[in-house]
Every structure is written in structure tokens, then in C-alpha cells.
UniProtKB/Swiss-Prot annotation:
Residues covered by region (Disordered): 1-127
GO BP annotations listed: rRNA processing
Assigned keywords, A-Z: Coiled coil, Nucleus, Ribosome biogenesis, rRNA processing
Subcellular localization(s) per the UniProt record: Nucleus, Nucleolus
Protein purpose: Involved in nucleolar integrity and required for processing of the pre-rRNA for the 60S ribosome subunit.
Source organism of the structure: Cryptococcus neoformans var. neoformans serotype D (strain JEC21 / ATCC MYA-565)
Official protein name in the record: rRNA-processing protein CGR1
InterPro entries: Cgr1-like (IPR005579)
Domain of life, source organism: Eukaryota
Stretches with biased composition (Basic residues): 29-39, 107-127
Family classification: Belongs to the CGR1 family.
Length: 127
């Protein structure tokens, strides 16, 4: 250590650096932070960038097309279900008719048998 500390202090006097006020006026420890701004993506070409309104119009058109497609699909499915129901009803009627026909045939066979039996009795008696 030398005997002239005051002269060296003057030569290397601390320089005062003004501290920039940070966000919300909080300076301690934040002087090195710069104010941040919203990100602007400059790497997207202008031909790709579209205004919000145009994008919304396009989205509405797509939604309308989807809605129309959905309605057409529902209509087609309803028509298919109607045809399936008609076929099922037709088959059920046919089966019911067949069952009634078999029942009639069975009943008429029994009736014929009874009539033959009566006829046979009368022949024996009359015969």
C-alpha cells in the first residue's frame, strides 16, 4: 500500500451510471432489464398473413359447409332407417300371415276329420 491513497482515488473515481427506471418504477436489481414488447413474427411471409376478419369469414364458410354436410348425412340416414323399418314391418306382416295360414290349415284339417268321423257314423247307422 502506498502513502498516496487519495491521489489514486481521484484518478480512478467511480463514474456514476444513470439507472434506467424499470417497469412499474421498480429500480433495484432491474436496471439491466429492458422493457419487453409484443412479439411480431417477421418470418411469416406477407402472402400467408391474412387479416382476422378474412379468417373469420373463411371459418364461417367452413362451418356452414360442415352444417350442410351434416344435415345431408342426417337426411340420408333417416331415409335409410325409414326403408329398413318398412322392410321389417313387411316381414313381420308376412310372418303373421303365414302363422295365421298354418293355424287355419290346422283348424280346417281338424274340422274335416270331425266331419269324416260323423259321416262314417251315419254310414254305419244308415248303411
Amino acid at each position: 500500500m502506498s502513502a498516496e491513497p487519495s491521489s489514486s482515488a481521484q484518478a480512478s473515481a467511480p463514474t456514476v451510471v444513470s439507472v434506467a427506471p424499470s417497469k412499474n418504477g421498480r429500480t433495484p436489481g432491474k436496471a439491466h432489464k429492458s422493457a419487453k414488447t409484443a412479439l411480431r413474427r417477421s418470418y411469416i411471409s406477407p402472402s400467408v398473413k391474412t387479416p382476422f376478419e378474412k379468417r373469420m369469414e373463411k371459418e364461417k364458410a367452413q362451418q356452414a359447409a360442415k352444417q350442410l354436410e351434416k344435415e345431408l348425412k342426417e337426411e340420408k340416414e333417416n331415409e335409410r332407417q325409414r326403408k329398413v323399418n318398412i322392410i321389417k314391418e313387411r316381414r313381420a306382416r308376412k310372418e303373421e300371415k303365414q302363422r295365421e295360414e298354418e293355424l287355419r290349415a290346422k283348424m280346417s284339417a281338424k274340422k274335416l276329420q270331425r266331419m269324416k268321423k260323423r259321416e262314417g257314423r251315419s254310414k254305419k247307422i244308415n248303411g
